[in-house]
Amino acid sequence: MASRSAGTLLTEFNAAYVPPGLMPGYKGHVPGVAFSFGSPYGTTTLKYFQDQRNAALGRSSTAFSRGGHFPTIFSLNPTQVLRNRALTRDRWLHTPSYTRFNLDSSRWAELLHFYQMAQRHREHYQDKTGLVHRVPYFVLPVKEWDRYPIPTDLPPLSPKEKWHLLRVAPENLRTYQTFPSGKRVSPQERQRRDCYFEFRA
């Protein structure tokens, strides 16, 4: 028989008693929890869960199925001991990704530099504006004669082009200065005159 002191009282009115299995919206049963019309099933189960969770957080030594799982150094439960976890399932999570002695630092620096160049090349490849410069490392090589053609392999020059090249040659350029009076001054005289006037100033 349900009694108030035992905590198993389901309702205060026997005439209005409805079995929990026939109540609309009933989703289950929590044993050991007093259920009544004043406290809906959702509120009761939420309070039961919060109480169990707070108790588990306070102890920090129960299994996860009972509301909390906190690994410790010393515990009565062997699945929570840090040493046991490190030897079983969590050994791959804490695997070091570094080496104690770096014996090939130059190779590591080379790989890091190559990775940075690859990222810059990726940015250049994805660029649509043409503002990102290309990385020379990833430019495909071409034949030497395509980049630096031999002069004998070029087509012959026309007389007009030959005359133009001879006219702009350094030995054919005018290096003298012509004054309005018609007098021409050589570069050597101009150099001496400039030194004199610079010294006088």
Curated annotation (Swiss-Prot):
It is found in: Cytoplasm, Cytoskeleton, Cilium axoneme; Cytoplasm, Cytoskeleton, Flagellum axoneme. The keyword Cytoplasm applies. It comes from the Eukaryota. Its main location: cytoplasm. GO terms for cellular component: axonemal A tubule inner sheath; axonemal microtubule; sperm flagellum. Keywords: Cell projection, Cilium, Cytoplasm, Cytoskeleton, Flagellum. One of its GO terms (biological process) is flagellated sperm motility. InterPro entries: CIMIP2C, CMI2A-C-like_dom. The keyword Cytoplasm applies. Microtubule inner protein component of sperm flagellar doublet microtubules. Belongs to the CIMIP2 family. Microtubule inner protein (MIP) part of the dynein-decorated doublet microtubules (DMTs) in cilia axoneme, which is required for motile cilia beating. Binds to the intra-tubulin interfaces. This is Ciliary microtubule inner protein 2C. It comes from Bos taurus (Bovine). The lineage of its organism: Eukaryota, Metazoa, Chordata, Craniata, Vertebrata. The gene is CIMIP2C.
